[in-house]
Every structure is written in C-alpha cells, then in structure tokens.
C-alpha cells in the first residue's frame, strides 16, 4: 500500500507519505452447516518503501497528474496529523495489528445464491504509537448476498462499523460509519477468473474537513487462479477511485481455500 496525501485546513494539517505492507493470517471454518467463523491476525510493516519511482513512471507514461508527489522526497516515511490530537510517526517497523474475529449465519447457501449475516469484533492488540491500532475495541455488522450463473457471479454487502473508543483522534473517530461493497466476477474457463469490486464508506472522523478522513471510494481489479481443487491464488490492485480519500494504490496477493 503506497500513499502520499498532503492536506491543510484552518485548524488541521495532514501528511501521509509512506508504504505499508500487511500480511493477514486468517483461519475460517464452519461450526454447523449454517454457522461459520473467521479469525484474522495482521502483521504490519510501515516504511518508506520502494514504489515511489514506479508510481512516478506510471503517471508520466499515462500523462496523469502526480499531485503532491513532485514536492516530496521519494521513499520517505512520515505520518503526521495536527488537530485535536497530534500524530508524528517517522520510524519504520514491523508490528502486530488489531486481531479480529467474525461469525456469520447463512440463511441460504446453494450453488445459485448465498445470503448471510455477519458480526465482527476487533481487539486493540496493535499499538497506537505505531498507528497499527486505534486503541479500542471495534464492532461491525453486515449482510452479504451473492448470485451465481454459469460464468458470472455478483455479490453485494451492506453494513455498519462502530468503534467503541478512539485514542488516535481524541475521540473524533468514535463515530458510526456505513460501508458497502459490490463485486462482479467473470469465469474464464475452469482455471482463471477476473473480478472487479467497488468499496465505499461514509465519514470515519467527525469535526474535520480533511478529505482523507472523510467518505472513501475504492476500486479493486484482480484475477483468481485455481491452483488445486482446494486452493486459489488471488492477485490484483486497489485504487483510490474518488481521489484523495484512501491510499493511492494497494497491491495484493493471497492464497485461499
């Protein structure tokens, strides 16, 4: 995940310039035919990274506006915010993030369609000093529905997220936010498939005009390869679709059963 976002308002200033690599270790299983659970442990590394040069070349090749990137050194790490609270992190490091647990009930689960309801709880196992945690327990509830055809699959999710506290933004992020996801997958034979996904979320921090802390919209484009009968390889990228509302670009690679 590579980001360079610089904003200044009358009472607030934000600079997010760095690269974050996250390894998510997840275990998912079924309790009964209708109930499933999932536990995820993230390992997060923040650094100056190495993708700034490649992103600059991408902008030049396609004639895109590089935004604030031209004014900042390459491969530096600065996470700075001044407002009700002050954040200034410039130290690289690898740390455990917030561990999450989720449980889902499947009202319907067949070859043609799926309907499920989920609830999640995130524990403050990360560090507020390294920005790998907000220092509070967080909850979320959402519904998921999917429809499958011979070569196409479409899925929709709608939910609410509620932090139970906030130690990063002095309580300003203790706000309920809504999120939504729409995904479409096209099978290309028995081995490969392509997927496009749109994720949106409402404001996550109150009392700010900073665009990066407001509503967000992200576009995911990726591919899935069936490696064995059980295992799948997923790869692709996530782009900030609304501009300056999320990390500039995120590349992902995952193995799932």
Predicted feature descriptions by range:
Residues 1-164, 169, 173-257:
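Transmembrane beta-barrel domains of Gram-negative outer membranes and organellar outer membranes
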């Amino acid at each position: 995940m590579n980001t360079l976002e610089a904003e200044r308002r009358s009472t607030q200033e934000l600079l997010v310039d760095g690269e974050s690599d996250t390894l998510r270790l997840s275990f998912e299983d079924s309790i009964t035919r209708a109930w499933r659970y999932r536990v995820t442990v993230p390992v997060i590394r923040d650094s100056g990274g190495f993708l700034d040069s490649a992103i600059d070349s991408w902008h030049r090749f396609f004639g895109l506006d590089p935004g604030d990137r031209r004014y900042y050194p390459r491969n530096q790490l600065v996470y700075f915010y001044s407002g009700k609270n002050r954040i200034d992190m410039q130290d690289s490091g690898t740390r455990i993030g917030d561990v999450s647990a989720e449980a889902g009930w499947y009202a319907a689960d067949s070859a043609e369609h799926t309907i499920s309801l989920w609830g999640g709880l995130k524990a403050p196992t990360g560090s507020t000093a390294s920005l790998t945690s907000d220092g509070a327990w967080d909850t979320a509830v959402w519904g998921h529905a999917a429809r499958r055809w011979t070569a196409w699959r479409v899925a929709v999710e709608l939910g609410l997220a509620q932090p139970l506290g906030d130690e990063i933004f002095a309580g300003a992020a203790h706000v309920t936010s809504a999120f939504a996801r729409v995904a479409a997958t096209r099978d290309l034979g028995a081995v490969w498939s392509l997927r496009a996904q749109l994720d949106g979320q409402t404001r996550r921090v109150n009392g700010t005009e900073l665009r990066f802390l407001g509503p967000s919209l992200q576009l995911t484009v990726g591919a899935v390869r069936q490696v064995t009968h059980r295992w799948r390889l997923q790869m692709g990228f996530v782009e900030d679709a609304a501009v300056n509302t999320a990390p500039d670009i995120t590349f992902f690679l995952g193995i799932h059963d």
